[in-house]
């Protein structure tokens, strides 16, 4: 019987080898992709539970199937914990991803063809904030705002003038590659001035917001969307928050039946675990450590005139570096660092001149290394290793030295093999 085949290693060796190889990669590589993190074993256990067997279309207390009394408890726990964590009146935990959460928010707030003001992808926004290749750009009339050409930071006066000119129905704040704190109160004032809704996508900073080390958008935005991984350190999934009861009903309808069928209750259970972890006072220490580590790492690049730190610094978990003085483009930098077991991604910088497939910059985030227990000293060491590798990109002997130093670091801070 299928129930006898409980061991993946014995039943499907080919698949197991790939899983095991990924486990080894995570153990022995330094993870600096800003959208990635390392979840607890409790989060993984919940996601791998028998809840994966259960269909539960609808919401707690109002399902289309029977036998949902247990998953109602699970989902209610996740909802209540999310509300408490972020100080929101309403929470939807069913969105399968941040993109699904954003799609639901758009459906709740605007109609197809409406004008939306969102952060341009090249300035640090996200695909779902109006990229022409994404559903958002195809469905709605997005106009992009950028950063100041000199400071590479948001210029709220310029955004206000742009909002006056285009008269959007919705303004989207939030980013996927912006290293500075966002003033959500100013964004709400801009939205109110032109009679627009304000939606905030806090996917990247949700963990920092939950811990109180970054300003919260919840008091200001009509709707807040997020992922549950990244700095929040939960399973891959989406979350939607609001303080408006009428909008909460629209959000629920947009998710089901608008965009999705049955929710992934095993993932929702893992979200509930992650929310409980984030409610622990120790999570604030973790979030502050992310900020401290990121600032320390960024400072090393700022002190080296062969590199240019975008906007001159960072206030959160991420920063961008222009690497073109030492290597041709960000793509080559990403590939080279992969070879020495440091994982990050190429990234466009504001007012980019290279192809998006090459880019001038790299994006670096410190959530994952902080989860391993690394601190300021290790963050500075990693920055120096990156510089050492990039500057000596054609010196195999030096690159091998970097590999060995990376291995020493990862061995000193094991992930799951403790």
Swiss-Prot record:
Subcellular location(s) per record: Cytoplasm
The protein's enzyme class: transferase
EC number(s) on file: 2.1.2.1
CDD domains per the UniProt record, alphabetical: SHMT
Tagged with keyword Transmembrane helix: no
Transmembrane residue ranges: none
Sites bearing N6-(pyridoxal phosphate)lysine, chain numbering: 230
Pathway(s) the chain acts in: One-carbon metabolism; tetrahydrofolate interconversion; Amino-acid biosynthesis; glycine biosynthesis; glycine from L-serine: step 1/1
Residues given in the record as (6S)-5,6,7,8-tetrahydrofolate binding sites: 121, 125-127, 355-357
Record's subunit section: Homodimer.
Family membership noted in the UniProt record: Belongs to the SHMT family.
Name of this chain's protein: Serine hydroxymethyltransferase
Organism, scientific name: Streptococcus pyogenes serotype M5 (strain Manfredo)
Gene that encodes it: glyA
